[in-house]
Amino acid sequence: MLFLKEEKDGVLLKVRVQPRAARNQVAGLYEDALKIRLTAPPVDGEANEACRAFLADSLSLPPSKVEIVSGHASRTKVVKIAGVGAEKVRRAFGL
């Protein structure tokens, strides 16, 4: 089951990032996280920025609304997405 927690100002979403992929895409679920493949390498925060940009673009939000709360140096991250509800996140990623 996906870790997706609704808060009063947005949602917390657990993601599993696979860097250096062929293209940016959602790859389904990995345990309780949304698996995201990204072309960016895991160097100097590039994959983190690509993750923020990909999630923001998928939800039609500015990247400033997406913040990595934990897991900055890990493939598994918890991301806070401001200004959306859990249902919009589920629809955007086909969950």
UniProtKB/Swiss-Prot annotation:
Domain of life: Bacteria
Gene Ontology cellular component terms for the protein in this record: cytoplasm
Pfam family, one: DUF167
NCBIfam families according to UniProt: DUF167 family protein
Family that this chain belongs to: Belongs to the UPF0235 family.
PANTHER family, per database record: UPF0235 PROTEIN C15ORF40
HAMAP family reported in the protein's UniProt record: UPF0235
Name of the protein this chain belongs to: UPF0235 protein PTH_1821
Organism of this sequence: Pelotomaculum thermopropionicum (strain DSM 13744 / JCM 10971 / SI)
